[in-house]
Design a protein with these regions (language model features):
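Hydrophobic anchor at the beta1->P-loop junction of P-loop NTPases
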Residues: 25
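P-loop (Walker A) phosphate-binding loop of NTP-binding proteins
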Residues: 28
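ATP-dependent small-molecule kinase phosphotransfer cores
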Residues: 55-116, 120-122
């Protein structure tokens, strides 16, 4: 390798080291992702910006457009795809029809200047990591014992204007497949955060993020 090539390689490594990070919060349904996400965004010391994903599913009680997700229609999804700005997408056949979740390069992501946090899945993590680079995209994987998780999901569903227990059961079973140990290993996720106790879990996640950023 010549001197110029070596200098360029070193320069690329330095630029990568000083680029921002995108932390992707993952876990099965009712594992506490939304609560953890909201808390981390409000820790000023971490300075995380929100990366809001898109979905075509209906809003749930208490959700706001632009906070949990950008709630859009099928036409918006197709527009992103046709313009080549679709980073990743997932489609789920639910009891209420087809629901899409996707990440789009909408001009609001600047890893040169900011660190971000988003909520996703193993599938979206792999595609976002491929798009932005392995060094820039880091997983935050939450775990909760299945019985506790189901209890939380039932309580949350009861608060909805029109509870949909059939969809709750579908999500619960789908999570067992989507977040199986084989897929977790394939995604190279080695650090997990137990969310049985919220305070302890938050302390562990904050400590990890600080170790990465500082």
């Amino acid at each position: 390798m010549g001197k110029d090539s070596k200098r360029q390689e070193i320069g690329q490594r330095i630029r990568k080291a000083f680029m921002g990070k995108l932390f992707l919060l993952m876990g099965k349904s009712a594992s506490g992702k939304d609560s953890i996400y909201d808390h981390l965004l409000n820790v000023s010391e971490l300075g995380l910006e929100k990366l809001v994903l898109y979905t075509t599913r209906p809003k749930r009680a208490g959700e706001l457009d632009g906070r949990e997700y950008h709630f859009v229609n099928e036409e918006t999804f197709l527009s992103f795809r046709e313009s080549g700005r679709l980073i990743e997408d997932r489609a789920y056949e639910t009891v209420q029809g087809l629901w899409r979740y996707f990440t789009a390069d909408d001009g609001k992501i600047d890893l040169q200047c900011h660190n971000y946090i988003a909520i996703g899945t193993l599938e979206s993590y792999e595609k976002i990591r491929e798009y932005f680079g392995k060094d820039q995209v880091l997983p935050l994987y939450l775990e909760v014992e299945d019985g506790e998780r189901l209890s939380r999901a039932l309580l949350r569903e009861k608060e909805q204007k029109n509870p949909n227990y059939e969809e709750l059961c579908r999500r619960f079973l789908a999570d067992c497949r989507d977040f199986c140990e084989e897929k977790i290993a394939e995604s190279e996720i080695t650090v997990r955060f137990q969310n049985q106790d919220r305070t302890t879990c938050l302390e562990a996640i904050e400590s990890y993020i600080r170790s990465v950023l500082y």
